[in-house]
Curated annotation (Swiss-Prot):
Organism field: Arabidopsis thaliana
Domain named RRM: residues: 323-409
UniProt-listed Pfam families: RRM_1, VQ
Gene ablation phenotype (knockout): No visible phenotype. Nsra and nsrb double mutants are less sensitive to auxin.
Name used for this protein in its record: Nuclear speckle RNA-binding protein B
Gene: NSRB
């Protein structure tokens, strides 16, 4: 019975021929390590060798470095200070310096015991510098303002010793903190008054009167510019926008009533909103300036006061003036919504009413009658002055131009017997 697995049976076959291995391949050849080259023995140097052939002495090794600093001291203490820094001491020098300390300021660097070389020269340098600075200040305590007192004090005591002694600089100047003596002096008129110190005194500002004419006005009594006060009764965002714009008086024979009041584009094109009508109305009743002719056109330039109104007494509007505007010149295909977009930004706007009438001619376009209602006559006058000669489409040369006037009940037409039924 064959106990071999089926897998082993499938692998059965003719045995391969045995490999022929040469006997040399079993040998492992290990090369010996390379021996270092033997140095050639040099002949012994004789004492008769010339000194020029000897090696140069090695350079000095810097164990530490000290940043160069400037130490201010008296000439009599210079030798003592050098000996303290270099580590050399002398009892005779110490005694001579102590005897001369009665007539000159005492140097605390002599009190530092560094004669035995127990500390490094760098540490000795730092201790000595700190002691000298504290001693030089002495009783002259008070910061940067007292440096001059110390300087003049030493010049008065020893003028013969300090002739070649420069003025000490106790503060090392830098980029962010320059010394007090390196800064130029400030002229008295360098700073100017920005505002009044006392509100009641009213010190004048240093602002030219013509620089900010749109925001400041000149007081006639004291010549003090101040903010423009909004005293108008029609106070709204749109009215303030109108007041901020500059007023141009452009009289034109082709313009309708109240031309020249608002802001007119050059070349007789659309009439942009201007601040004048909102500013010329004193109260809700409204008024017109005396510069206007009976037909509503401007006669010239009027002098404005601090709030932009003419300096002359304005004429009030007629008492029976209507708060409804009659608008002519609308296209025949315009809608009520389009007309409302024109008048909605104005203060006091209520509604727009359109009446369409058929043309008398068969091929003619229908006529559109437009009536715009406002809260009062002053609001209606503001819109009238702003939209007079308004062009509906600037790109079209034959575009319609709006003609606005106050609406009134028309009387009997010529040739009619009675009134309108």
């Amino acid at each position: 019975m064959d106990n071999r697995s089926p897998r082993s049976r499938g692998n059965m076959g003719p045995k391969p021929t045995p490999l022929k291995v040469r006997g040399d391949s079993h040998k492992i050849i290990k090369k010996p390590p390379l021996a270092p080259p033997h140095p050639q023995p040099q002949p012994p140097q004789t004492h008769q060798q010339e000194p020029s052939q000897s090696r140069p002495p090695p350079g000095p090794v810097n164990i530490y470095t000290v940043t160069p600093r400037i130490i201010h001291t008296h000439p009599n203490n210079f030798m003592t200070l050098v000996q303290r820094l270099t580590g050399q001491t002398s009892t005779s020098t110490t005694s001579s310096s102590s005897s001369s300390s009665t007539s000159e300021p005492k140097d605390t660097s002599t009190m530092v015991d560094t004669s035995h070389g127990l500390i490094s020269p760098a540490a000795r340098f730092a201790v000595t510098e700190k002691a000298n600075i504290s001693n030089e200040l002495g009783t002259f305590v008070g910061g940067e303002g007292t440096m001059d007192q110390y300087y003049h004090h030493h010049h008065q005591e020893q003028p013969h010793q300090n002739r070649g002694f420069e003025r000490p600089s106790f503060h090392h100047a830098g980029i962010l903190s320059p010394g007090p003596y390196s800064l130029p002096s400030v002229s008295p008129d360098f700073f100017s008054t920005i505002g009044p110190t006392d509100p009641q005194e009213g010190t004048p500002y240093l602002i030219p009167s013509g620089d900010m004419h749109s925001y400041l006005s000149q007081d006639e009594d004291r010549g003090i510019p101040h903010s423009v006060k909004d005293t108008r009764s029609i106070g709204s965002a749109y009215d303030r926008y109108l007041q901020s714009m500059q007023t141009f008086f452009v009289p034109s024979e082709e313009a309708g009533p109240f031309n020249g009041v608002g802001m007119v584009r050059q070349g007789g094109s659309n009439m942009m909103p201007g601040p004048s009508m909102g500013e010329l109305m004193a109260g809700c009743g409204g008024s017109l300036p005396s510069d206007f002719r009976p037909n509503g056109r401007d006669m010239g330039f009027g002098q404005l006061d601090s709030v932009g109104r003419p300096g002359r007494e304005p004429h009030p509007l007629p008492p029976d003036v209507s708060n409804t505007l009659y608008v002519e010149g609308l296209p025949s295909n315009c809608s009520r919504r389009e007309v409302s977009h024109i008048f909605r930004p104005f203060v006091g706007y209520r509604e727009v009413r359109l009446v369409t009438q058929d043309s008398k001619h068969r091929s003619g376009d229908p006529t559109v009658l437009c009536f715009v209602d406002f809260e009062n006559s002053a609001c209606a006058a503001t819109a009238l002055s702003a939209l007079q000669d308004y062009r509906m489409d600037e790109d079209e040369p034959d575009s319609k131009i709006l003609r606005l006037q106050f609406f009134r009940n028309p009387g009997p037409r010529p040739g009619q017997r009675g009134g309108r039924r």
